């Protein structure tokens, strides 16, 4: 129904929209009238158990697969709304977009007795990846979408070593585990992939999942922090993290977001030495970024300082394409200078060839 509304009576009382429905969890009772779903009432708490992950193709290039080939370490069941077929361990099941099974809805692959499903048509750094939980296959206009429905703690076993070397110190692995768990909890409420019945994908767009197989050291860190998440005023925080620091962190203003909405993200120096620098000052920032301080924790890593050389034509073409893309997504934020010096939002696809890049102001 066009007037569909959700009433949350568990957390006091709040009016929400269909975008607030959490995929894979039955937290609401739906209201049906005259053959239409016209509303819902949330009356239950979210008890986090599983997360639903879209598995991208080889190279993490797309969520759509031209075909899917899989097998299992134990016997497994392939089912749709209309039929079920049992396969033996080691049997190969293959699906193409024109397979009539997909006309029956989602195809679900469920292993017996804790078996793991190997996706033979996908390659990762570790080789052929295998997955706990179940695998769902759904038809889409551009191919087949693969969704792995897996317990959160099992998901973390293949996230932590994919995001941080398992050879790192145990306390570092524990921190990574807590951050990864918090990130997963937060994105259960993310509706970006709701049309595909998923919460996240397995690439750097979210958290890298199962690029590296699980390791005993990271598994221990996950077990020792089981259930631990980061919160602020009772809410799970958005735990962004990255691999290498330049010697200073930043707040969400780097993405144009309002830093006051995320008070737990604070810009700090990441160093053994005490520094008093104003990095919003261009001269101070230039001196900072063009020098190296051995006291900075990441000073020994290649990406601590880096340079880029780019062909000016290729750079201009890339910028023009991105500029138009940004204009389409947020036209009010892309302003073009007019003849009288004022700035207005208008369609712009090409500013020509870039001649120079300057910084007018640092946040």
Predicted segments — roles?
Residues 1-363:
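Conserved, single-site charged/polar hotspot
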């Amino acid at each position: 129904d066009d007037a569909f509304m959700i009433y949350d009576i568990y957390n006091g009382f709040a009016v929400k929209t269909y975008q607030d429905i959490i995929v894979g969890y039955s937290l609401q009772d739906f209201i049906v009238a005259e053959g239409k779903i016209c509303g819902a009432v949330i009356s239950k708490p979210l008890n986090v158990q599983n997360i639903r992950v879209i598995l991208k193709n080889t190279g993490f290039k797309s969520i759509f697969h031209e075909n899917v080939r899989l097998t299992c370490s134990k016997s497994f069941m392939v089912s749709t709304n209309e039929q079920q077929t049992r396969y033996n361990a080691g049997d190969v099941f293959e699906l193409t977009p024109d397979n009539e099974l997909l006309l029956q809805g989602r195809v679900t692959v469920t292993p017996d007795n804790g078996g793991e499903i190997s996706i033979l048509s996908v390659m990762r750094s570790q080789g052929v990846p295998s997955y706990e939980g179940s695998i769902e296959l759904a038809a889409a206009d551009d191919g087949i979408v693969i969704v792995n429905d897996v317990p959160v703690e099992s998901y973390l076993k293949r996230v932590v070593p994919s995001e941080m070397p398992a050879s790192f110190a145990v306390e570092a692995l524990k921190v990574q585990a807590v951050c990864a768990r918090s990130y997963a909890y937060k994105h259960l409420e993310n509706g970006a992939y709701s049309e595909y019945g998923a919460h996240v994908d397995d690439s750097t767009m979210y958290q890298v999942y199962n690029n590296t197989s699980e390791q005993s050291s990271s598994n221990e860190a996950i077990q020792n922090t089981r259930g631990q998440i980061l919160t602020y005023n009772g809410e799970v925080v958005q735990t962004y993290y990255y691999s290498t620091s330049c010697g200073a962190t930043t707040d969400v203003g780097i993405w144009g977001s309002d830093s006051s909405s995320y008070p737990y993200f604070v810009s700090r120096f990441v160093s053994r030495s005490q520094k008093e620098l104003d990095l919003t000052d261009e001269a101070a920032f230039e001196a900072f970024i063009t020098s190296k301080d051995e006291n900075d924790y990441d000073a020994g890593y290649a990406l601590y300082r880096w340079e880029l050389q780019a062909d000016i034509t290729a750079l201009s073409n890339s910028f023009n394409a991105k500029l138009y893309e940004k204009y389409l997504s947020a036209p009010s934020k892309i302003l073009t200078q007019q003849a009288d010096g004022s700035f207005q939002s208008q369609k712009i696809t090409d500013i020509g060839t870039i001649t120079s890049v300057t910084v007018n102001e640092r946040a």
